[in-house]
Regions:
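Structural beta-sheet core signal
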Residues: 9, 103-105, 143, 213, ...
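Anion (oxyanion) recognition and catalysis
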Residues: 91, 95, 121, 202-206, ...
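Active-site-proximal loop->helix
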Residues: 110-123, 142-148
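Hydrophobic beta-strand scaffold residues
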Residues: 101, 127, 211-213
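Conserved beta-alpha-beta core of the PfkB/ribokinase-like small-molecule kinase fold
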Residues: 181-267, 274-275, 280-284
Length: 284
């Protein structure tokens, strides 16, 4: 390996379309709220796929969004996704410290895809293998209620996987696995990477990489098996291959199948995760 520290990441990279000031307790929003786990309705703090939300409500997504937002345009458009955002932060913090941060992924060749590509080009992250495909760019509509939970605030997420379906393990080249640190971020929204995570982690460890996994709400598995714990890769062998696991409390509950924070942490320890961060905003 070179003297420079190389960090390579793959995972969720998308466009966030933020709508502020959405009242989660309003009569307008009430018909769209979830009634049971995985049903496709909205839940504060959680993510649902736009297609599932359409099925749940029985209306096209654009019509639903107009009803929820009053037909207004989004307040802000941003680079989003737990993989690329954390990598950008790391690159900004280490830019002058002999560290190079790289990203692998796929976007769509559409208007917001061009926005995303241009915006990423303004960051210190090196786009090692980021290409635009004929699929639509991954995006998340973010509904924000700053008054929710006694003023602590909360968000709800409506995601479209889009071109993230085109991101596959074979696109991760030797340079990826020759990195000092590899980061798999929010891969539940990049299905082919997520479903092969055990083998990818195994390959990374065999090449001497320090492995980091940071999670995101896994609606795909929540929908498929709402009563079962979420898989991370092919099987639980993934955990012993992770040097640092970063998850929030709700995701920790779903991944472990436990309903208590201490029990969830015990599960990860028993699975031989080397180190672990579980966030619990705003009560952390």
């Amino acid at each position: 390996m070179s003297e420079k520290i190389i960090v390579s990441g793959v995972g969720c990279c998308l466009v966030d379309l933020l709508y502020n000031g959405i009242d989660f307790q309003s009569e307008t929003l009430h018909p769209f709220l979830s009634k049971e786990r995985g049903d496709g309705g909205l839940t504060p703090g959680q993510l649902v796929f736009q297609e599932e939300f359409e099925q749940y409500c029985g209306l096209p997504f654009t019509d639903l969004l107009d009803k929820i937002t009053g037909g207004r345009v989004y307040d802000k458009i941003n680079i989003g996704g737990p993989s690329i955002v954390s990598l950008i932060n790391a690159a900004q913090l280490t830019e002058n410290n002999h560290c190079e941060v790289r990203f692998y992924g796929r976007g769509g060749n559409d208007e917001i895809g061009q926005y995303l590509l241009t915006s990423l080009g303004k960051t210190p992250v090196v786009l090692k293998d980021y290409q635009l495909t004929d699929n639509r760019t991954p995006s998340t509509v973010v509904l924000s209620d700053p008054t929710y939970d006694n003023g602590h605030g909360e968000r709800m997420f409506l995601n479209s996987i889009g071109a993230a379906w085109d991101c596959t393990p074979d696109q991760l080249d030797d340079d990826f696995f020759d990195s000092n640190i590899v980061v798999f971020g929010g891969t539940a929204l990049v299905p082919h990477i997520h479903d092969n995570l055990t083998e990818l982690l195994k390959k990374a460890k065999s090449r001497g990489c320090f492995t980091i996994v940071n999670t995101v709400f896994d609606f795909r598995n929540e929908k498929a098996n709402p009563s079962k714990k979420w898989p991370i890769g092919e099987n639980d062998d993934s955990y012993q291959l992770i040097d640092l696991l970063i998850t929030d409390q709700e995701e920790a509950f779903r991944l472990s199948g436990r309903k208590d924070a201490t029990e969830a942490i015990r599960f990860f320890i028993d699975q031989k995760v080397s180190s672990l961060i579980v966030t619990n905003a705003p009560n952390r």
